[in-house]
Design a protein with these regions (language model features):
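C-terminal transmembrane helix pair
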Residues: 129, 133, 164-172, 288-296, ...
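Transmembrane-helix boundary/entry motifs in multi-pass membrane transporters
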Residues: 33, 66-79, 118, 206-210, ...
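Membrane interface segments of multi-pass transport proteins and intramembrane proteases
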Residues: 59-72, 311-322
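Juxtamembrane and boundary regions of transmembrane helices in multi-pass small-molecule transporters
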Residues: 50-53, 72, 76, 115-126, ...
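Short helix-coil transition sites and intra-membrane helix breaks within transmembrane domains
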Residues: 2-7, 36-37, 48-58, 88-102, ...
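Select transmembrane alpha-helical segments in multipass membrane proteins
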Residues: 38-43, 76-86, 124-130, 287-293, ...
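Hydrophobic transmembrane alpha-helices of multi-pass small-molecule transporters
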Residues: 1-40, 164-313, 410-416, 420-430
Length: 430
């Protein structure tokens, strides 16, 4: 998973479970591609992907960045670039968002006569990619983050979306705030020209058309109920219907069905071209990775394989006599190192079943450990093989390899430092 495409290893992993005799191929296939998390992720790709495909996310991004209140406030303007990227990436994981924001920023620094090798330009280019990664870690409601969230719930214990975001939202805001502070005070990047930039020039010349408005409101309704299904207390009368019978997967599915069924342009055409959106926006390598993650993790923790017994026997000495604080610190350090040396998806999949028995035996804080693992495993920020977004950074022509790795490493260090007090608060309060 570290040095090659994730699709074929995922397929091979599913088939291998049958070859080694753990289960039949039918069971492996249904346990992977038939898993509810895969279905939910596919439907989320349709709903969120429609926003990208028909230009809604670009419209939102330009609207956020063209507010008059940002004029003459260079630090706030750059922070809003990061914050708006994080906000959008809660709902969509399309790498096109990095390319879109790079294109917008490219136009800004050229208008202001910045040299593309200027420290402000190069550090902000990396900062945009960091904001994409950090934003994707805020809420595990889609893609492989959702699979890790559910995997942790199955093997260790429930986290709760409210608790999760209670740590990750301030973590994200503080992380990008810390990176901006580094740019201004340590790197001493020149923000002065941004103060003269007319932010209203970024606004859209046209208003949203009827298709874009319908897609935006569909997404708003779908994501409202997705969050409601996760945050609704079990004592609520609506809980059985919203959280159990329909659930987040059902709301994404209803949204996907609606955009395919609804019409636009006076009923002359469908709201979306389902086949085009699916072809452009559904990431099959990620779906295969999610599916293989769920079924392989199940095999890892099954007593008949003996893998967990082997891990417990060999790592019991590390945790012997140690308390919950040791497990928390150990988890933070190991996950931060490994997720930057190999595929973050694979590391997350492996770490959860490995840590599961020791979380229970040491009386560790179940929600906090889960939040920290899923949050930090997202931060594959250094080596290109760690995550797909980071693979784009060295390819940006404005960056040298030294700059790409320098700013990525600094970004990771800032995120780790920010995570420390959040982990302490979580361990004491959750």
């Amino acid at each position: 998973f570290s040095a090659c495409e994730v699709a074929w290893p995922s397929i091979l992993a599913i088939v291998s479970l049958s070859v080694v005799g753990y289960c039949s191929l039918n069971q492996a296939a249904s346990g992977s591609l038939g898993h509810a998390v895969v279905f939910q992720s596919a439907m989320a790709y349709i709903v969120a992907g429609s926003l990208n495909y028909y230009g809604v996310t670009e419209y939102i991004a330009r609207w956020l960045l063209s507010r008059k209140a940002l004029s003459g406030k260079p630090y706030l303007f750059v922070y809003i670039i990061y914050a708006s990227m994080m906000l959008i990436c809660i709902f969509t994981s399309s790498l096109a968002m990095i390319i879109l924001y790079w294109a917008i920023f490219d136009g800004i620094y050229k208008v202001l006569d910045y040299d593309k090798k200027d420290k402000f330009v190069t550090s902000t280019i990396v900062g945009i990619a960091l904001a994409f990664v950090v934003g994707g870690a805020i809420a595990p409601i889609r893609s492989w983050q959702l699979s890790l969230f559910n995997l942790y719930a199955e093997q260790v214990g429930e986290i709760g979306l409210g608790k999760f975001m209670g740590l990750t939202v301030p973590g994200a805001l503080l992380s990008m705030g810390g990176y901006l502070l580094y740019q201004a005070k340590i790197l001493k990047a020149d923000f002065s020209r941004i103060a003269t930039f007319d932010v209203t020039s970024l606004s859209n010349s046209d208003k949203m058309d009827s298709r874009q408005k319908k897609l935006l409101w569909t997404a708003v309704v779908v994501f409202f109920f997705v969050f409601l299904s996760a945050l609704l207390p079990k004592s609520s009368a609506l809980y059985p219907l919203i959280a159990t019978k329909i659930s987040a997967a059902g709301f994404f599915a209803l949204g996907a069905a609606y955009v395919g069924l609804a019409a636009t342009n006076g009923g002359k055409e469908s709201l979306v071209s389902f086949s085009k959106v699916a072809g452009a926006c559904i990431q099959w390598p990620v779906l295969l990775m999610i599916g293989s993650t769920m079924v392989v993790a199940s095999a890892l923790t099954n007593e008949t394989t003996g893998i967990m017994a082997f891990i417990s026997e060999n790592l019991s000495g590390v945790f012997a006599g140690k308390g919950s604080w040791f497990v928390l610190i150990f988890t933070m350090v190991i996950v931060s190192i490994l997720t930057n040396a190999a595929s973050n998806i694979a590391i997350g999949t492996a770490m959860i079943p490995i840590l599961a028995p020791f979380i229970a035996s040491t009386g560790s804080n179940v929600p906090t450990i889960g939040i920290i693992v899923i949050w930090l495993v997202n931060m594959g920020l250094i080596l290109p093989g760690a995550s797909a977004p980071v693979g784009l950074i060295p390819g940006n022509e404005a960056l040298t390899s030294k700059e790409a790795y320098k700013y990525s490493c600094i970004g990771m260090l800032i995120i780790f430092i920010v995570t420390i007090p959040l982990a302490i608060i979580g361990n004491l309060c959750l």
